[in-house]
Design a protein with these regions (language model features):
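Extended amphipathic ligand-handling, pore-lining, and cofactor/metal-binding catalytic surfaces
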Residues: 1-122
Length: 122
């Protein structure tokens, strides 16, 4: 599913697409300045495009500098720290990229914690 519907109100892929779109809009990125991929694949049926393949493709297409954020996660974990910040970085740089800037998750950012506290009081 590429968008939420009554039949699939909690579609992970649709939520990731919408969250990413909203982040790109807030950052005033043009359509060709951002993209989406999916990591931590479990078998061949996982959601595509696969992050490792996209990192190679981007480097081969001449993208030299990459900023990476994982908006599906609110805290860093093995998937973000090891898969993205370590292996993803290595994959991109080995494929020809020059810089890989991993942007950490919200983690314990004060404004995020304040939001959670206020939301839990409702």
């Amino acid at each position: 599913c590429d968008m939420e519907s009554k039949a699939k109100p909690f579609c992970y892929k649709a939520q990731v697409i919408e969250t990413s779109r909203l982040c790109a809009k807030q950052l005033e990125l043009k359509e060709d300045e951002w993209g989406i991929s999916f990591q931590s694949r479990i078998g061949p049926g996982w959601i595509q495009p696969f992050t490792d393949k996209e990192l190679v493709r981007l480097a081969k297409e001449g993208i030299k500098n990459l900023d990476v954020v994982c908006p599906a996660f609110v805290t860093d974990n093995l998937e973000t720290l090891e898969e993205m910040n370590i292996r993803g970085r290595e994959t991109f740089l080995e494929a020809g990229g020059n810089s890989f800037n991993y942007i950490p998750c919200l983690n314990d950012e004060e404004s995020w914690v304040d939001f959670l506290v206020n939301a839990s009081k409702r």
